[in-house]
Amino acid sequence: MARRMPGPTCCGDARRNFCDDLHGVRGKFPRLAIATSTDLFHWKKQGLAFRQQLDGRFCRDFRSKSGSIVCKREGDRFIAEKINGKYWMYFGEFGISLASSKTLVNWEIALDKKGEQPLLVAPMRKGEPWFDQETTESGSQAFITGDGIFMIYDGMAPQRPDLALTGKIWSAGQILFDLKDLTKVIGRTDRDFFHPEKDYEKQNVTKGAGGANNVTFISNLIYFGGKWRFYYGCADSRVACAVSTK
């Protein structure tokens, strides 16, 4: 029997590769969940990603979203790849952490010696117009390259005087993790490479939905037809695609 969750609910910000994830929202707490499919039309919801760890500690009033599973690229496909016998996933909302799994369904957060969740990618320091000075969040799927594990991430700043934008502004940066130590950051952009410019990226068009302005929020990266493309949310009300040949 299905159980109705109290408060507003939704599923959103899915990341798709050869495995999948999404996050569900119960009231004010987003929580990472897993869904699987063999044909991309029919989906099975597998439940909350961290439900088995520490007797469900990370299912009760614990914010988790935006899972980016580490993959390898084979042609146009991104396939979840085991490293040291496990699958790995970067995730987080106000900072990026790491989790592992043997099944791609049940996940465990990599905790420190005190049993706490460390942030591998924290917001940039305050005092300058950093694009991610308030929030860092996993964006595209992470994938293995010759230099390390590459991932696009989303960052938020309370204002961007360099762009003449005010309010919360969501932009995108790039990060590189060490393949031998997945907790180690070996490269990170100081400036965003993608930010709100178009009217549909700056202005939310959904009246009464509580959406935000000034948002370019990247969720998926694909390689197709010899070009890199990513899909991204625009001002919490539309979806667009950006293309690069580099």
Language-model-detected regions and their locations in the chain:
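Extended, compositionally biased non-globular segments
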Residues: 207-209, 216-221
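Short, surface-exposed charged micro-motifs
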Residues: 10, 141, 220
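Beta-rich carbohydrate-recognition and catalytic domains
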Residues: 1-4, 12-134, 143-211, 225-246
